[in-house]
Amino acid sequence: MNELLAEMAAVSSRRKQSKPRRMSGEGDAMMSPIDLSTKSFDENNCEKGAGGALPLEDRSNILPHFSVPFANPQQFLSLCAQLGNSSSRNVSSTASTTSSCPIQSCSQSFSSPAALTWHVLDAHEDEQEIFSCDVCTTTFSNGQDIREHKCQKTLASRSTSVPPSTIPSSVCFLSTPTTPCLQFSINESIGTSEIREEDEEEDMDVEDGEHVANQLFGHLLQKSDDKSKMASLFNHAFPPFAAFPNMPPPFLMRQPFDPRADVFAAGRHDNDDDWEALMEISTSDEAEKIRALVGDKAVPTTDPNQCILCRRVLSCKSALQMHYRTHTGERPFKCKICQRAFTTKGNLKTHMGVHRSKHSFRGLPISLPPQLAAMHQHQHQIAPPQRIHIHNPPTSAASAAAAVAQIQASQQCPICQQRFLNAGELAVHITEHRNSLTQPPRVMPTPTTTRVQTFPFVPFFTTPPSLNATDMSTQFNLANILSAQLKNDSSPNTDTSSVEEKITRDDPPKMASLSPSNSSDSSSSVRQDILESSEFEEKLKKLEEPPILEQQVSTTPNPKNENPLLAMQKMWAETEPPPPRQMPVLSKHQCGVCFKHFSSSSALQIHMRTHTGDKPFKCDMCGRAFTTRGNLKVHMGTHSWQQSPSRRGRRIFDVASSVTEKPMLQSPILPTSGAPGASPLAMLGPNGLSGLEMMMMLWRTVCSVCQKVCQSPNELEQHLKEHLNNGSSAAPTPLASAATPPPS
């Protein structure tokens, strides 16, 4: 220690400006000393000395350590120490040997390197290449470049497997990685301050002015950003605890990112009725369509919200954009469920209410007692949806018609208009629709059930009232109940089976199978699918053939062998009326016939006219009727005889009254003289026609040459041909002679 002090005293010409730093042993392993040596690092001196301390370099210039907020303060202080080095020629420093300003135009000298550094940073801020790095010999012009400097050589050396204890602190601090060096912390500053106090007790010759300069230097360094200071404190104030050597650094204690969070976030929806996925928004260029309609000769508008096509002034820019869609026909908002398009998103959201409501299903089948209805409902709730099968094929034309009617009574999905055989399949299909609404946009799910496409859809009534047919599954249930009651009967099995066979052939749509053997073995027997076209056609061919067994049984009737079940069925059908049909619960704007949903009551009212056949708007010209007034207006355009600008914009219902009030002025075919004469309107007679219809008849039947009133358009055509053949000097008709005033 004394030898090192002697060397330092020989080098320093003025006074001792710094003192060597003592390295801590194993007990102070957590406090790394700050070495401000200006000499390049000698790898031969990296070996540990006695006592576990590293030997110091022979020349050093150490300043009191201040807790500064720079990203790498040791590098900045090391460059400041180069300015105070006086006689060493081996250091790469551009500072003068007498602590004078290195700038040639400035002749000031300072008592300490801290004061010199203050002067250089304050007065010569714009000078080039004042400071340099000891490791990579990079030059700097200001302190900001020094703080942002990252030495690449030391970064490469730190990637090796050299233990941190064998690397001097100067190299560690000169290297500026992305994150500041871990050895710099508040504990180190506290430890170095204690060492400085011990050195100051040993070296009492340090002047008080140097402490003042150091305080000013520390105040200068404290002018950096508060954010970097707080980041430095949080990143380096707490070193790893000695009792847990395997603990990672503090910045690695952060909770790792869990990729499963995005998976759950993607599948989570705040609202089950999120219909945005079912809305398709087109991004076509509407301005290009408007330019195509306007053309090259566009007249400039006088208002920013004026339509360039029809010169209509709108209230705002958005209203103008909506108005342009009436010209271009653009409908950018489309429903993915029914493929309908709308001009505004609000209209599309209103339309989505048609699909938003929970769809009601059909009630229970007709003509079922309460016990069987409850059993039927319980079976449909438990049993999975299955296709309808029959055990015994029908054997008559009436039974074939009943089977066809049963197939025609299919269920239809109100969303995608798919048809199904029973309400169970429809319920499963609509449940898939509801489940798909909360998922990302994908292809609409297709059910695995069989779709009915070959038969038309019967909207409400499942079967015609004349056939008295019930559901096939209900027939099987009724057959099982009645056959169970037959087990207690004492009648012979042979007679019962023969009569049951007759009953089966006589009335198959009412009773599919009545024998106990057939009812018990119906589940194990092979059932033929009626949806297969080839087999179904064969069954229909067999139905047309007269059954032989039926003729044999009918030729030899036996009243004693009459089945009591048939009598019970006839009694039930004749005496007890069928219970009323259970109507489903409808939504606010849902049709009770086809169960379609509508957005408003007016739309539902117009739709109901398609079921009732009501057409309240009738054309007075041709007698055609329409369900809406708009359709009638479009139809009246076919009867218009002129499209003059004076008539445009007028209501079609006001034309008749105006024509009736001023017939002489509106009709160009009538004589203009004021002489009394019979007008064509008067010649038509009071036939109860309206004024508009009378004008149309005049236009079609009155000659424009001689004003003759013909009885039909064909007669008028023949009359005009006569004018063409005979010339324009044809004799005037009695109408023209009567209308012409006599000469005075």
From Swiss-Prot:
Among the GO molecular function terms of this UniProt record, one is: RNA polymerase II transcription regulatory region sequence-specific DNA binding
**CC per GO annotation:** nucleus
Q: Please name the SMART domains in this protein's record.
A: ZnF_C2H2
InterPro entries given for it?
Sal_C2H2-zinc-finger (IPR051565), Znf_C2H2_sf (IPR036236), Znf_C2H2_type (IPR013087)
Question: Per the record, what is the consequence of mutating H323Y?
Answer: In n2654; severe pleiotropic abnormalities, including defects in the development of the sex myoblasts, a mesodermal cell type, and of two classes of neurons, the DVB and AVL GABAergic motor neurons
Q: Where would one find coiled-coil regions in this protein?
A: none
**Claim: Zinc is one of the keywords in the record:** yes
Query: Where are the C2H2-type-classified zinc fingers?
Result: 99-124, 305-327, 333-355, 411-433, 589-611, 617-639, 701-723
Which stretches does the entry tag as region Disordered?
6-32, 487-530, 542-562, 725-744
Q: Where is the composition biased (Basic and acidic residues)?
A: 499-509
Q: Where in the cell is it found?
A: Nucleus
Compositional bias segments (type: Basic residues): 13-22
Task: Determine if Ribosomal protein is one of this entry's keywords.
Answer: no
State the Gene Ontology BP annotations: mesodermal cell differentiation; muscle cell differentiation; myoblast fate specification; negative regulation of transcription by RNA polymerase II; neuroblast differentiation; positive regulation of gene expression; positive regulation of transcription by RNA polymerase II; regulation of transcription by RNA polymerase II
List compositional bias (Low complexity) regions by residue number.
Answer: 513-525, 728-744
Extent of Polar residues compositional bias: 487-497, 551-561
Which Cys-Cys disulfides exist here?
Answer: none
Protein keywords: Metal-binding, Nucleus, Repeat, Transcription, Transcription regulation, Zinc, Zinc-finger
User: What's the family?
Assistant: Belongs to the sal C2H2-type zinc-finger protein family.
Functional note: Transcription factor, involved in positive and negative modulation of transcription. Binds to multiple DNA sequence motifs in the regulatory elements of target genes, including homeobox selector egl-5 and LIM homeobox mec-3. Involved in cell-fate regulation in multiple lineages, including neuronal, mesodermal and vulval. Required to regulate the fate of PLM touch receptor neurons, acting via negative modulation of transcription of egl-5 and mec-3. May modulate gene expression by interacting with different transcription factors during neuronal and mesodermal cell development.
Kindly provide the name given to this protein in its UniProt entry. Spalt-like protein sem-4
Q: What gene does this protein come from?
A: sem-4
